[in-house]
A protein has these predicted regions:
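Short alpha-helix in the alpha/beta-hydrolase fold that links the catalytic acid
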Residues: 292, 453-463, 487
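Gly/Ala-rich beta-loop-alpha elbow adjacent to hydrolase catalytic centers
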Residues: 347-358
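Conserved acidic catalytic loop of the alpha/beta-hydrolase fold
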Residues: 327-345
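Catalytic histidine-centered segment of alpha/beta-hydrolase-like enzymes
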Residues: 312-318, 380, 451, 471-473, ...
Length: 497
């Protein structure tokens, strides 16, 4: 589903006002309640009020929330600092950018069902793009600018500002004239004009702002200590439940896992006996996957669950604002496989986990024997749907409000997206997949996904030679449902294992 600027629905308004506003209001209430209780109420009034359990609960919460809010304010300021990231070099970035621009360029002559070799192009001309392909790209390109302005309002300097970030993670004014980055940026603006069949108006439109995740402010919304207590309690209880069901906690390098050995099952006679690595998505942690985990534990294969504190509200964990890097994830995955004697695995990833999945496919492809991607957000990242919808699209429906406030604006998640996001590194291309037969690859998408343009992803997969036997688009489903709700999506995932 493409991003929409439709007004907030009635259900969305109710969700925004009731749970969201109430959670937000707890901290201001705490700052009022503590001085009110100690400075305004008399001794007899304090005794009377504290006899009420609800008041006592709010008071104790306020005692915790006041100092915690100061800590969270400091942590949020700290999260705004720029972070040094390792980006692909100019030659690699040139190839990636051209490869992305090449996708969908010839819609009238699109070849479906043929796997494409790695691009060897060093440029892109206007003649290589038909008008249908240019029209689609004109719509997508606007999503890299706040409010999705008409293309006519995006001037050349605005476009250069975004391209400088996209290909060099730099501001145009900081790029040295004649440097490799400067050459690539100038090439990029010309290629983009060819791809769009559009020449940008000279100058800069001050009303237009580009979206540059690693440079823009971290968009985090405050939440009370009670929110983190509840979320972390759910996570700890989920860990405890897993450990009492035969699992272990193990650490390899900078990454930790919940693991369990094989459970022999005479019905398992195929390659489905491969160990399974589960890489979860954004949210409150493993607790949100409880329905899926109950069924996941019933699998006879060895299982591994990657722990990701930075996207699981674990605010006091050392990785909350300092998650392991791509190379550390790959090294840890190789280490756990070597320690356990695994020569190949099934990788199951969900939502944001599909970006980590992309790292593993490029860094340890030999170990990724079978790949299952649910609610995949790592395809077609250059089109801007995911970034715009997750961070900048006005909320419309109940699920968008819940995801927008309770997930996207949570500090750890916001910092991960805004300070650790290298789009070209988290991008998953068809060529990264070792095999594309149905036994080795399954991609599960949601028809009404408000983060991902499922139709565009399916079109890309078809254009790249991936057959319908490898793709499931769950009718009527919304983002996240594939592993949260036991319906068609989850059933397909479990069958794929």
């Amino acid at each position: 589903m493409a991003p929409s600027d439709a007004p907030l629905s009635f259900g969305g308004r109710v969700t925004l006002i009731v749970p969201t506003a109430l959670v937000w209001a707890l901290t201001p209430l705490s700052w009022v309640l503590v001085p009110y209780h100690h400075l305004v109420l008399s001794d007899s009034q304090r005794v009377a009020w504290t006899s009420r359990y609800w008041y006592l609960f709010l008071l104790y919460h306020a005692y915790l929330d006041v100092p915690f809010s100061v800590f969270l304010f400091w942590l949020t300021k700290k999260a705004q600092r720029p972070k040094e990231l390792v980006h692909p070099g100019p030659d690699e970035m040139r190839r990636i950018f051209l490869e992305c621009l090449e996708v969908g360029a010839k819609l009238k002559e699109r070849q479906v069902g043929i796997r494409k070799p790695r691009t060897t192009k060093t440029s892109l001309t206007k003649e290589e793009v038909d008008e249908m392909g240019a029209e689609v790209m004109r719509l997508k390109f606007r999503q890299w600018f706040r409010g999705r302005p008409p293309l006519s309002e995006i001037y050349r300097a605005n476009a250069i500002e975004w391209i400088a970030w996209a290909v060099a993670d730099a501001r145009p004014e900081d790029v040295v004239s004649g440097s490799e980055a400067d050459i690539l940026i100038n090439e990029g603006i010309e290629w983009m004009q060819h791809r769009l069949h559009h020449d940008f108006t000279p100058g800069r439109n001050p009303k237009v702002e580009s979206i540059r995740l690693t440079m823009d402010p971290v968009r985090a919304a405050h939440r009370p200590v009670g929110y983190y207590i509840v979320c972390n309690s759910v996570t700890l209880l989920t860990y405890a439940w897993l450990l009492t069901n035969g699992c272990r906690y193990e650490r390899y390098g900078e990454c930790a896992y919940i693991t369990r050995g094989a459970r022999p099952d005479k019905r398992s006679k195929t390659s489905a006996g491969l160990p399974i690595l589960f890489v979860h998505g954004l949210g409150i942690g493993l607790g949100q996957y409880l329905d899926f985990l109950r069924r996941f534990l019933a699998q006879p294969q060895p299982i591994m669950i990657l722990i990701q504190p930075n996207i699981s509200t674990q605010i006091f964990h050392r990785h909350f604002l300092h998650p392991p890097s791509k190379d550390e994830h790959v090294a840890s995955f190789k280490a756990i496989c070597a320690a356990k004697g695994y020569t190949g695995c099934t990788i199951l990833s969900h939502s944001n986990g599909t970006m980590v999945h992309a790292w593993l496919l490029r860094g340890a492809k030999e170990l990724c024997r079978r790949n299952v991607l649910a609610d995949a957000v790592s395809f077609c990242l250059w089109q801007g749907d995911v970034c715009y919808s997750f961070l900048h699209q006005p909320w419309r429906e109940t699920m968008e409000v819940l995801l927008g406030y309770f997930v996207a604006r949570e500090l750890g998640t916001a910092h991960t997206i805004c300070r650790n996001f290298i789009w070209s590194d988290m991008l998953l291309m068809e060529r990264d997949l070792p095999r594309t037969d149905p036994a080795s690859l399954q991609i599960i998408l949601a028809e009404h996904d408000f983060l991902v343009d499922a139709d565009a992803v399916v079109a890309y997969l078809h254009e790249s030679g991936i057959s319908d036997d490898c793709i499931t688009c769950v009718k009527g489903a919304q983002h996240g449902a594939a592993l949260i709700v036991h319906e068609e999506g989850m059933k397909k995932v479990l069958a794929s294992l």
